[in-house]
Amino acid sequence: MKVREITEELEYKLLSPYAAKSRESRGRAREEEKCDIRTDFQRDRDRIIHSKAFRRLSHKTQVFISPEGDHYRTRLTHTLEVAQIARTIARALRLNEDLTEAIALGHDLGHTPFGHSGEEVLNKLLKGGFRHSEQSIRVVEVLENDGKGLNLTWEVKDGILNHSTGGKPSTLEGQVVQISDKIAYINHDIDDAIRGRVLKPEDLPKDLIAILGDKHGKRIDTMVRDVIYNSMGKPEVSMSKEIYEATYQLRAFLFEKVYIGSKAKRDEEKAKRVVEQLFYYFYDNVDKMPKEFVRLAEIYGRERAVADYIAGMTDKYALLKYKEIFLPSPWFEQNIFDL
């Protein structure tokens, strides 16, 4: 018996009846020969980790644009925190950890530079709108691997597509990632806001802190434990009413004090202008994009290809392209022998 087959048999023996089983996957868009060692969900996880889009997450904004300091979250550290929380919950509920981890690692692959600021601009400019969850699917189906995509399983793509608020993942593993995403960003955005002096610990609503905890780690522990004990033996993943209400009131507090009305957002309009002007420039000058995006423009149209190009940019690369295109180069940077 192959190692993969042993692992698949163990899933039936050890996992919850509500867990997704590798052998029962709805499969891939293109059939592939099975791996002797890894299950299909394990292969998906590995493909995501080795993708270029995953590596670029390290230079994409989470909340704070161009923060001064080495300890602020990026889109990559957020992704890793989501994966850690999700695996803890999945293991406790005896769900499929490999599927959970693959969804968690891939859930933000389509995020724009400058966080949700970049997403707002592309959503305004594209006729059909722009959502990072849908772009994440486009990354794994079309943009990665020289246009062939990663050919992920249906279950992983379903979890990625439906991870945002309002989505309805078809697997419990997808539900775990959806709730873990909220737990991660609510807590680490508070941590970053305090580090950036946007908030002080005493600013946090006392009634909510009394329920959830007065420290970063304590709040995460409270939420994770609540999800686990409230979901055991059930065909859905959720928080208890008390913790859910406290968590979402804390989220509303963040929207008011950090995401919308704080000095942390002072550069947001500048970032939006960068994305907008890059979009218009490349829309009018398709030939200035890398050749793979010129090819995409021929297949999917200019608007879609330009959005694909810009959405894949890191903050640093977007600013570099903006500087190259729109800002004059000082003459003293030139070699005098070129004059």
Swiss-Prot record:
Gene3D superfamilies: Hypothetical protein af1432 (1.10.3210.10)
Molecular function GO labels: triphosphoric monoester hydrolase activity
Domain of life: Bacteria
PROSITE patterns to which the protein is assigned, alphabetical: HD (PS51831)
Family classification: Belongs to the dGTPase family. Type 2 subfamily.
PANTHER family on file: BIS(5'-NUCLEOSYL)-TETRAPHOSPHATASE, SYMMETRICAL, SLR1885 PROTEIN
Protein name per UniProt: Deoxyguanosinetriphosphate triphosphohydrolase-like protein
Organism whose genome encodes this protein: Caldanaerobacter subterraneus subsp. tengcongensis (strain DSM 15242 / JCM 11007 / NBRC 100824 / MB4)
UniProt lineage: Bacteria, Bacillati, Bacillota, Clostridia, Thermoanaerobacterales
